[in-house]
């Protein structure tokens, strides 16, 4: 194989490929980039860590068609230090790769393309199109509540449901739950013209990488394809794909309480600022001690925030709108901050029942075309 590439263009193009490189594997092939130069004037580059993968297509002058696997880290580092305008990549019959640019020559071992694991089929009949900014904003609201190492596999990801032109995302790690739904234009319908209806669970790591790839530009879209075990995101010139988590997701509607009797409307940014100050105490690392919690006392039209640790204490208060009896309740401070930062509302409404039952955090003003809800379990206070 021998191909010639624009060095700056290829250096920029290969950066997203690194999201699917496995750093801890006994399989050397998935530590590399599969370069396939069997087409005309283009070559494809693929990375796949057996859970998620990325494929890009780049312009190339194909001198000798072929395919090979080159170590991803070494390839990217070599491109970065080369100085010529173009890079020539040659792989001989002994799988020795040679990278030339300007007067510089770098050689490294490669692997035959046949050793690369089978990549899932990247196009299926079931697909739809949605705005990148819409999907990215939804991920912003639910990413903080995803589990990564829960004994229940379905919680180690984000649940999505599409029905009647409405996209819903839900995440839960047993201590907190986040739910977001938007009514948006979803291109593609069923053959009879009806709206699409299906659900799927995307792994936590995949969601994190997808968030980095999506743009805030409202004009940009992402085309999504689904099969029984795989999801594919077509984002511009990139194809990002991942396995799906199999199984029935939790019945989150049953978990979310709607019988609260105590309500408080608070300024979100003001509360976050107060909790950030409390974090100086709750997140102190002291030998032999655990992180402390933050206490919230809803008393009349005041919210009193306090925390005590081995090295100090903090107190703060702010004005709120309060309905119901007074209540003292405690939380993991970081969890509460993450919950509030996931929203972008000026004011949020906190619904409570007791010091031992979960709270709901929602926008103070409801919207017709969107919905968001954050549920958080309190921590038990020492007597």
Language model: regions and residue ranges:
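Structural preference for solvent-exposed beta-strand-turn elements
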Residues: 1-383
């Amino acid at each position: 194989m021998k191909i010639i590439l624009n060095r700056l263009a290829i250096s920029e193009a290969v950066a997203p490929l690194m999201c699917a490189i496995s750093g801890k594997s006994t399989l050397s092939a998935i530590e590399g980039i599969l370069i396939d130069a069997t087409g005309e004037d283009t070559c494809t580059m693929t990375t796949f860590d057996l859970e998620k993968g990325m494929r890009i297509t780049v312009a190339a002058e194909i001198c000798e068609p072929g395919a090979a696997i080159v170590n991803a880290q070494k390839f990217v580092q070599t491109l970065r230090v080369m100085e010529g305008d173009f890079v020539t990549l040659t792989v001989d019959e002994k799988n020795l790769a040679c990278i030339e640019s300007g007067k510089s020559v770098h050689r490294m071992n490669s692997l035959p393309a046949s050793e690369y694991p089978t990549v899932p089929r990247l196009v299926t009949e079931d697909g739809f199109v949605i705005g990148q900014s819409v999907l990215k904003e939804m991920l912003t609201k639910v990413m903080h509540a995803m589990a990564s190492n829960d004994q229940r596999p379905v919680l180690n990801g984000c649940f999505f449901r599409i029905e009647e032109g409405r996209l819903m995302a839900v995440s839960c790690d047993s201590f907190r739950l986040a739910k977001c739904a938007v009514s948006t234009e979803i291109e593609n319908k069923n053959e009879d013209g009806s709206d699409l209806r299906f659900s799927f669970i995307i792994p936590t790591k995949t969601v994190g990488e997808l968030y980095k790839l999506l743009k805030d530009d409202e004009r940009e879209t992402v085309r999504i394809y689904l099969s029984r075990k795989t999801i594919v995101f077509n984002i511009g010139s990139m194809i990002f794909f991942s396995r799906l988590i199999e199984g029935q997701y939790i019945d989150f509607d049953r978990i979310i309480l709607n019988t609260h009797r105590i309500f408080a409307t608070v300024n979100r940014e003001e509360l976050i600022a107060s909790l950030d100050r409390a974090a100086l105490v709750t997140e102190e690392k002291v030998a032999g001690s655990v992180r402390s919690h933050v206490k919230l006392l809803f008393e009349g039209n005041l919210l009193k925030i306090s925390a005590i640790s081995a090295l100090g204490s903090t107190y703060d208060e702010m004005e709120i709108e309060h309905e119901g009896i007074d209540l003292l309740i405690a939380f993991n401070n970081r969890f509460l901050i993450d919950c509030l930062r996931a929203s972008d509302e000026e004011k949020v409404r906190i619904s409570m029942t007791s010091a031992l039952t979960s709270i709901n955090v929602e926008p103070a003003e409801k919207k017709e075309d969107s919905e968001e809800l954050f549920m958080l379990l309190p921590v038990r206070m020492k007597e």
